């Protein structure tokens, strides 16, 4: 039996019981009470360095080049960001629930880190170097994550779980916002178009599958 998907009732030979519900009219005595909670996730979850932008300062140099100085939120006392120079940053803002109607993605290249003030300086990627063909500046309350890095190979991978895409994926060799087939390390769930369109792959679009770049056995 399973705590989450079992049915009916049962007691095994060791005296472990599972039931759908239990009513006790007088009292219940137990040695230890363990409460299991189920945690739900909506949207996307990335296993990588992440921060929240507290405020944004636009900086223009003598040549007219615009950068953005991001003041990051302190997550606890003494916190400083783990972001590093060369990081490809993906930022998402969604305030639709608050009624402001703001929802967009920002792609940035990290140019400087100041851990003393917990600030970073970033440049925006050009529109034609982003997946949607349109980029947006960072803003207050935006969540940012390291997508990859254009300098350090050790920082060019991350794992993300997406309830919107229906996939668990490890990205590898990520040096820019736009991904290609060489950036997929493993995939569980919905396969990308480059795999579903391959006539040698026996799956249709929308089928659940497992893809691994290298399998050792």
Regions found by a protein language model. Name each.
Residues 11-14, 55-69, 112-119, 162-164, ...:
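Short, ordered beta-strand-loop transition motifs
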Residues 73-152:
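Ser/Thr/Gly-rich low-complexity blocks that favor extended beta-strand/coil architectures
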Residues 1, 69-75, 85-92, 119-122, ...:
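Short, hydrophobic/proline-enriched secondary-structure or compact coil segments at domain edges
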Residues 1-35, 166-168, 172-173, 177-180, ...:
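Low-complexity, small-hydrophobic/phenylalanine-enriched stretches
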Residues 1, 19, 24-62:
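Glycine-rich, low-complexity segments
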């Amino acid at each position: 039996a399973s705590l989450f998907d079992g049915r009916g009732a049962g007691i095994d030979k060791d005296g472990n019981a599972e039931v759908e519900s239990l009513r006790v009219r007088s009292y219940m005595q137990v040695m230890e009470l363990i409460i299991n909670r189920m945690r739900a996730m909506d949207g996307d979850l990335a296993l990588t360095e992440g921060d929240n932008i507290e405020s944004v300062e636009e900086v223009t140099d003598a040549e007219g080049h615009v950068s953005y100085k991001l003041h990051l939120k302190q997550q606890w006392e003494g916190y400083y960001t783990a972001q590093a120079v060369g990081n490809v940053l993906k930022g998402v803002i969604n305030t639709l629930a608050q009624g402001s109607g703001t929802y967009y993605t920002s792609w940035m290249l990290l140019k400087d880190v100041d851990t003393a003030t917990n600030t970073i300086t970033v440049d925006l990627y050009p529109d034609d170097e982003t997946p949607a063909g349109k980029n947006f500046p960072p803003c207050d309350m935006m969540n940012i994550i390291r997508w990859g890095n254009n300098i350090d190979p050790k920082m060019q991978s991350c794992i993300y779980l997406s309830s919107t895409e229906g996939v668990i994926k490890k990205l590898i060799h990520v040096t820019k916002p736009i991904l290609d087939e060489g950036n997929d390390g493993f995939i569980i769930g919905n396969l990308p178009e480059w795999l579903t369109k391959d006539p040698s792959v026996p799956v249709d679009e929308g089928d659940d599958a497992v893809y691994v770049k290298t399998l050792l056995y």
